[in-house]
């Protein structure tokens, strides 16, 4: 985005994809547990546009307490995302570097998302979400 909040034309496709994903999350929000803090995992989070947007939707717009973990292979990207999260004082957001197969969440996720995961990461994300019996997988 530009300083005035305009989406750059080179990023308009990604912007539309993330907004569509947020529509999906909004549509299934009632299927997520309402009696506790939601546990969310974003596999292959990359620069975490979806991770931050999901947090905003759940925590700020839907007023649903949530704890979100973004996982990605690239340590440099994870460090940048963690820095941004810390600067924004988003304590319920955390980022980890690693492989999907080696990730162990603090508690079973209610929502697992994965947008454009590379190689076999989409298959790995689906398999892991099913194994954890996540309420919703997108």
Summary of predicted features, one role per range:
Residues 1-38:
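Conserved Class I S-adenosyl-L-methionine-dependent methyltransferase catalytic core
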Residues 36-46:
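Conserved class I S-adenosyl-L-methionine
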Residues 133-138:
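Conserved beta-strand signature within the Rossmann-like core of class I S-adenosyl-L-methionine
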Residues 101, 110-122:
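A short SAM/SAH-binding and catalytic strip from SAM-dependent methyltransferases
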Residues 119-131:
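A short, conserved alpha-helix within the catalytic core of class I
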Residues 66-72:
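Conserved SAM-binding motif I beta-strand of class I
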Residues 47-63:
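Conserved SAM-binding loop of SAM-dependent methyltransferases across substrates and taxa
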């Amino acid at each position: 985005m530009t300083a005035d909040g305009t989406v750059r034309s080179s990023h308009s496709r990604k912007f539309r994809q993330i907004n569509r994903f947020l529509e999906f999350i909004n549509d299934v929000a009632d299927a997520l547990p309402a009696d506790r803090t939601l546990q969310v995992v974003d596999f292959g989070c990359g620069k975490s546009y979806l991770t931050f947007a999901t947090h905003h939707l759940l925590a700020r717009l839907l007023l649903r307490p949530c704890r979100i973990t973004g996982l990605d292979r690239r340590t440099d990207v994870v460090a940048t995302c963690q820095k941004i999260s810390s600067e924004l004082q988003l304590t319920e957001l955390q980022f980890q570097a690693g492989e999907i197969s080696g990730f162990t969440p603090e508690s079973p996720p209610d929502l697992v998302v994965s947008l454009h995961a590379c190689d076999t990461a989409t298959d790995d994300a689906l398999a892991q979400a099913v194994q954890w019996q996540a309420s919703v997988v997108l």
